[in-house]
Amino acid sequence: MTRLCSVLSLLAFASLIGVSGVRADDAKDATSDDIEVVSYYFGNYHLDKRNEERLGKGWSEWELVKNARPRFEGHQQPKVPLWGYTDEANPRDMAQKIDCAVKHGVDVFLFDWYYYDDGPFLERTIDEGFLNAENRDKIKFALMWANHDWVEIFPKHKDVPSALIYPGKVTPETFDKICDLVIEKYFKQPNYWKIDGAPYFSIYELTKFAENFGSFDATKAAIERFREKTKAAGFPDLHLNAVYWGRPNIPGEATLTDPVKMIEGLGFDSVTSYVWIHHVPLNELKTDFNWVRDEYFKHWDSARSSFSIPYIPNVSVGWDSSPRTFQDDPFGNWGYPFTNTISNNTPENFKTALQMTKDRILSDPKAPRILNINCWNEWTEGSYLEPDTVNGYGYLEAIRDVMKKK
């Protein structure tokens, strides 16, 4: 915490540092009516050796999906996948996901990507499933480094503190390894997502990222090294994206004291959000989807006026993290994953939110023609596009209908 405080205390000097990167009025396809649809993808639905060592042989997050139960009146659980409990590390299963995504208008899978001081985690999703799928070139992909603490919430007991399993903070040496790895292994893939030729790479937890280096200047220098390595590999630049929020969710997350000064001062090229609830409090057990949408739009307006770099808006499918709770514990709004939920998140209301988001983007000539969606498969957080036995392909059909390409 001392190091973090020292980083934040230096932010007063950040305004003196020139901001690099793509300005809002230079963003990709700013005059197009076609919007690039990016879907986050959470890859914990396969067998991972670390998970099995901790949680038992054969464990994946599907176990939490299967074991979920209704926790209050009108609560629809468990969620049942229409395709069954697929193995995303199997290229055939991943090919099914790719075909479905492309058919319904998803252009990019933005994978939650994990790498800690002792190496990669959950990497089989991309390395074995996606990159070996026979149709992988139909869709683009990119990485969001999910550099948050990995804590024990699989499931979480109400009165037991979440044990820290893998710290999100890494050494500067580890970050250098990460830079080399992603450039060589992922950026050079022909279907890696690029903006104006620059590979897109997003960082999820900015306070944790700053802790890695101990000072603002050292953090900025690390980013510059990453950028220079990317250029040395033959790319015109790196498109570095920052995720930020005003409301921490997972234990260990923190907010930025001055996000604009930090994000722009460090030289990020764009900024975005991961999920609506990072900006909107869920004040009721069943908080209405349309109300959350409207509150998020207020945040979007604030972000657009505060940042001089492009803000990429988010559309969330829903929120219900109750499957990650110990099902025999009483349920209430006591802290993640014991949280209030989003209700009324029907495919029809999701479609309306998409249309409103599209209209807001197209009404702003400076806005990048990009939106992201949470999420392809956050089943245990109640925010997923994949078909289930209740709504079928409804959320995907909403994307297809609203985001028709010319």
What residues fall within each predicted segment?
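Boundary at the C-terminal end of the N-terminal hydrophobic targeting segment
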Residues: 20-24
